[in-house]
């Protein structure tokens, strides 16, 4: 089944100020410093799920939604306390991030058309289809915060995403770390796992290797806000 894609809006925009428009995960952050701040927070928060899981992360898409949402928050001392991180990150906040409203925080585009819809929830296929842009199938294109997309036909949940961390703040060695949630398994709720890209490329099951020779590896995708 082909991946649903829409053009990415790359123009500078004034987020969350135009007639109450939501911040779309399909719209690139206008300021380079905001993109750098978002990337730093997103990568850290995805990586941190391996160190201390949070109850809202139950599958691969939930891990990405969590890191995306929390990266946009104001990282106050109270936020740091509640986050249970082992240290207080010194990253700048995303200055153009909107505040959550009374109707929630619909960050993710979930439909196409003249009036696209936005929601707080988006599954793996929707995240890829409406909220990222493809970079091809060569992992040399990976930057920290990019996604690895696999599609496994025959599985109940065929679409699977992993986050490329690169250099981890929790590991002294390695610059090619990848983190992901397995999703529920027949034996339980699943878990967050972390692996080096080089190791993943030699996975015992070839269908999970991020290689151009693997038809189940769809490719590398970048969050459209970046």
Language model feature labels by segment:
Residues 9-18:
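Bacterial N-terminal signal peptides
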Residues 175-226:
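Low-complexity, Gly/Ser/Thr/Pro-rich intrinsically disordered linker/tail segments
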Residues 88-187:
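...with weaker cross-activation on analogous glycine-rich loops/strands in unrelated enzymes
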Residues 1-4:
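N-terminal secretory signal peptides that target proteins for export/translocation
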Residues 17, 56-59, 137, 154:
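Residues at the start of alpha-helices and the adjacent loop-to-helix junctions
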Residues 22-119:
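N-terminal capping segments
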